[in-house]
UniProtKB/Swiss-Prot annotation:
Its EC number is 2.4.99.17. Signal peptide: none annotated. It holds the Pfam family Queuosine_synth. Residues 150-182 are annotated as: Disordered. This is S-adenosylmethionine:tRNA ribosyltransferase-isomerase.
Length: 367
């Protein structure tokens, strides 16, 4: 299939710049025929006793570092305790051996590659890399979340952006960069995140509250966790018209023996397995061999396109994705190429909000 097969027209005003007023107050589209539009807090009505919900418990780190000379680096993947791969902008300003300082801490450029990719080494004074990032870094929001002027372009004020995107989130006090940072630190993180390592949020989980999880458990819905540390490569565009020539960056995954046992038992008992997010689905499918999920830690570069044979997942909860993205290709593989194009047309007509801070949809695997 061609890259152009996965294109569709998306009005820019549907790209969510802020989260909904409450996590579970976002819209939810159930991919039935016809589709059902509801609120996320009603997801309980579409799950049943015995269902297994699998979440990604990776925690987003403050992976964006603003350095001297107007250089920004976004960490991508941990290579060792003190070394990370990263993307730099503008990379042309960097040379191997460049050093940047914050107090008694040092960030060193050790390697430089094409497409802005670099390797960095941290020489820190009695703190870990994660502690350093928590103090000096920023939440690594996607580039399509644009709340201030960039490159001389005129944009809406934060208040105007909020009101036009979602009237429910209009605030009494004026938004400021400082307040936005606090908001993102809270809302660009799932409530169940545990293991530090992601440089982008597993966004399908952002809608869940403790109350929803408690109600699901009370209903008899089982919950399990896997880990996939989301890399910056998740935002890289596909540039080849032949989609199979595209290469995905590797990402670290982990499944505990306990979780593998829970998933395999659910499969044996023919209970529904629902992946919360594409990262969870990719972790499950990467670990599955002959229908059995294997425990362990590993790296995956799995690229799921139409024709892929799914072994683990019956339903997928996910946000709305970019045109021509690897994730839109994934949902077309999961729930049907024609069906997803039709569903997205409906979502756009209903003015549902797209991408990281946007609305969610429940998809059913096409048999």
């Amino acid at each position: 299939m061609k890259l152009s097969d996965f294109d569709f027209d998306l009005p820019t005003e549907l790209i969510a710049q802020y989260p909904a007023s409450e996590r579970d107050n976002s819209d939810l589209l159930i991919a039935t025929t016809p589709p059902i539009k509801t609120k996320f807090y009603n997801i309980i009505d579409y799950l049943k006793e015995g269902d297994l919900l699998v979440f990604n418990n990776s925690k987003v780190i403050k992976a964006k570092l603003n350095l001297e000379r107007n250089i920004t680096i976004n960490l991508n993947q941990k290579l060792s305790d003190d070394s990370w791969s990263a993307f730099a902008k503008p990379a042309r300003k960097l040379n191997i051996g460049d050093e940047f300082y914050s107090d008694n801490h040092k960030v060193i450029i050790t390697e430089k590659f094409a497409m802005g990719e670099i390797k960095v080494k941290f020489e820190l004074d009695n703190i870990s890399v994660f502690e350093f990032l928590d103090k000096y870094g920023e939440m690594p929001l996607p580039v399509y979340i644009r709340r201030s002027k960039r490159h001389g372009e005129e944009e809406e004020s934060s208040d105007e952006a909020i009101s036009s995107q979602n009237p429910e989130i209009a605030t009494e006090s004026k938004r400021t960069p400082s307040n936005d940072d606090k908001l993102d630190s809270l809302r660009y993180q799932t409530i169940y995140s545990q293991i530090e390592g992601s440089v982008a949020a597993p966004t399908a989980g952002l809608h869940f509250t403790k109350e929803i999880l408690d109600k699901l458990k009370a209903k008899g819905v089982q919950i399990a966790f896997v880990t996939l540390h989301v890399g910056a490569g998740t935002f890289l565009p596909v540039k080849t018209e032949n989609i199979h020539e595209h290469k995905i960056h590797t990402e670290y995954c982990s499944i505990t023996p306990e979780t593998a046992e829970i998933i395999n038992k659910a499969k044996q008992e023919r209970r529904r397995i629902i992946a919360v997010g594409t990262t969870t689905l990719r972790t499950l499918e990467s670990s599955c061999n002959n229908g059995v999920v294997k425990a362990g830690s590993f790296e995956t570069d799995i690229f799921i396109t139409p024709g892929f044979k799914f072994q683990t997942t019956d339903m997928l909860l996910t946000n709305f994705h970019f045109p021509k993205s690897t994730l839109f290709m994934l949902i077309c593989a999961f729930a049907g190429f024609k069906e997803m194009h039709e569903l997205y047309k409906y979502a756009i007509k209903e003015k549902m909000r797209f991408f990281s801070y946007g609305d969610a949809t429940v998809l059913y695997r096409k048999v």
